Swiss-Prot record:
Catalysed transformations (reactions): crotonobetainyl-CoA + (R)-carnitine = crotonobetaine + (R)-carnitinyl-CoA; 4-(trimethylamino)butanoyl-CoA + (R)-carnitine = (R)-carnitinyl-CoA + 4-(trimethylamino)butanoate
Name the record gives this protein: L-carnitine CoA-transferase
EC number from the UniProt entry: 2.8.3.21
Keyword Cell membrane: no
Positions with a binding annotation for CoA: 97, 104
Amino acid sequence: MNHLPMPTFGPLAGVRVVFSGIEIAGPFAGQMFAEWGAEVIWIENVAWADTIRVQPNYPQLSRRNLHALSLNIFKDEGREAFLKLMETTDIFIEASKGPAFARRGITDEVLWEHNPKLVIAHLSGFGQYGTEEYTNLPAYNTIAQAFSGYLIQNGDVDQPMPAFPYTADYFSGMTATTAALAALHKVRETGKGESIDIAMYEVMLRMGQYFMMDYFNGGEICPRMTKGKDPYYAGCGLYKCADGYIVMELVGITQINECFKDIGLAHILGTPEVPEGTQLIHRVECPYGPLVEEKLDAWLATHTIAEVQARFAELNIACAKVLTIPELEGNPQYVARESITQWQTMDGRTCKGPNIMPKFKNNPGKIWRGMPSHGMDTAAILKNIGYSEADIKELVGKGLAKVED
């Protein structure tokens, strides 16, 4: 396989990934591959570009490092070109409503006829099979959260609330990335392709697993938070200091002992309710739970965030200031690790946003390109798989492909 022009870097150099999907979930999977060195081709509709392009800034992050192919993959010669592309592809990711590709004639079996080693990742709201009532329904972040039991666990005691921004999309996209890599590892061992069925609601079901297990194995429903505080454990969650908010986790024998001395509760240590060796204070089951919250709230309210952080660092209590967005890039940890970076857009502007993550020591990822324009790489990609300029012109003339203006 001849690769498209791009630098060689990262742990996935030499891997070709193609994805078809709009907005966040499917493209996020492709984005991770692109930042780790894979050659990633982004398929867009010929007539209508990905709707994410209407956003002013986010696409410059979510579509960086990609090659843009505008092709009608379901019709006539456009379908033929897509299947030819699949012959040189390692991983194909599609995000749609249920078995949309199969309904339009592009089944796993058709793809494997062209490439028996192909890894195929199907990402949808409700999966590739199940009941007709659900399988073909559209789904977005909030739909997956609501259907999975994840949303009902979030928010305040008085009202559930979705976790934002777009949590289900990102969890599902990352699941597609990791699952496809696992499949690719096996394919290179066996030579046999794989098809992965990723249902967004099942991803969120698994992500919401912690307290669900108490219901499935005993019928206990975990209450939601009250003003950001852990529903079960005192000293855990969101708290207000004299000048802003922190989060903290009061966990550990020494941590509880020393903290209680500071807030005036040393006298309850070693009691039947708080015996020696206590590592967590249950908010409900421990009679002193409400008192712990009362004393902790009062102590924190009289101290600044900096004072609390300094003292908790001495006591080895996990704690962090709730940073505002403007505070991020000036934070010394962000600066030291270059967590926020800059890159050039295709039209020469400077864009600022999150850097590559995670950080590979020996084969680091990199940002080598901004978001390509609609159809920008169509001609180069088609030439790469054997199409002549005349062939490409014919596809464009039939409305089956779009090249850069």
